[in-house]
UniProtKB/Swiss-Prot annotation:
Residues in K-box domain copies: 88-178
GO biological process: flower development; positive regulation of transcription by RNA polymerase II; regulation of transcription by RNA polymerase II
Functional description taken from the UniProt entry: Probable transcription factor involved in flower development.
Subcellular locations according to the entry: Nucleus
Protein name: Agamous-like MADS-box protein FUL-L
CDD domains: MADS_MEF2_like
Statement: the UniProt record of this protein carries the keyword Transcription: yes
Length: 247
């Protein structure tokens, strides 16, 4: 006999309901994965348990990308079909979707920091790992780019400082060379002045009068031809010699 049709109604037994939810959830996630792989389709599956626990599945692309695509599509469809001139009606329709999106973003944020990972299946953990790996690669690429830019900027500053240092050193050398030339010229002029003053003819010595035996002063005349001075004929004789002469 064939299998009878199962009547769809709420399972009253709590334990049976939890077991059925776990089995059907696993089968639903499996079917979503199969259709994603076999048909190359973007699939997003969101399931909330009776306790409010979230279970989800997304294909290789992230859940946020699929939801954004769905929102754009649904928004364009509503704009084409909506005839309500009151925008508040649209706001009331968008509020539940925005609330659901906020919850998804908050949950993904917790997953990215390593929290609330128990409800995730192996496939979901693999998707999360791939997303984190991709994010880390982008972060490392950006970090390396910034480091290379910083190193290049420092090299440019170093080159500029070296050029400035060389220019200052050149100016200092030129200034020292000018000072050396000025000092050499000054010393040369000083030596020339000292040598010229060494050849000046000294003045003749002053001739002083000489004292004779008789007590009279007789000056010495210097003749123009360079002859020696002669004694003066007006030399006085003592009285005792005069007496003998008169005799």
């Amino acid at each position: 006999m064939g299998r009878g049709r199962v009547q769809l109604k709420r399972i009253e037994n709590k334990i049976s309901r939890q077991v059925t939810f776990s089995k059907r959830r696993s089968g639903l996630l499996k079917k979503a994965h199969e259709i994603s792989v076999l048909c190359d389709a973007e699939v997003a599956l969101i399931v909330f348990s009776t306790k409010g626990k979230l279970f989800e599945y997304s294909s290789d692309s992230s859940m946020e990308r699929i939801l954004e695509r769905y929102e754009r599509y649904s928004l364009s469809e509503r704009q084409l079909l909506s005839t309500d001139p009151d925008p508040q009606g649209n706001w009331s329709m968008d509020y539940p979707k925005l609330t659901a999106r906020i919850e998804v973003l908050q949950r993904n944020l917790r997953h990215f920091v390593g929290e609330d990972l128990d409800p995730l299946s192996l496939r979901e953990l693999q998707n999360l790992e791939q997303q984190l790996d991709t994010a880390l690669k982008r972060i490392r690429t950006r970090k390396n780019q910034l480091m290379h830019e910083s190193i290049s900027e420092l090299q440019k500053k170093e080159k500029s400082l070296v050029e400035q240092n060389n220019a200052l050193a050149k100016k200092v050398k030129e200034k020292e060379k000018v000072e050396q030339n000025n000092r050499a010229q000054w010393e040369q002029q000083n030596n020339i002045g000292q040598n010229s003053s060494a050849y000046v003819v000294p003045p003749p010595p002053l001739q002083l009068p000489s004292l004779t035996i008789g007590g009279s002063f007789v000056g010495r005349a210097v003749e123009e031809d360079g002859a020696e001075a002669r004694p003066s004929p007006n030399t006085l004789m003592p009285p005792w010699m005069l007496r003998h002469v008169n005799e």
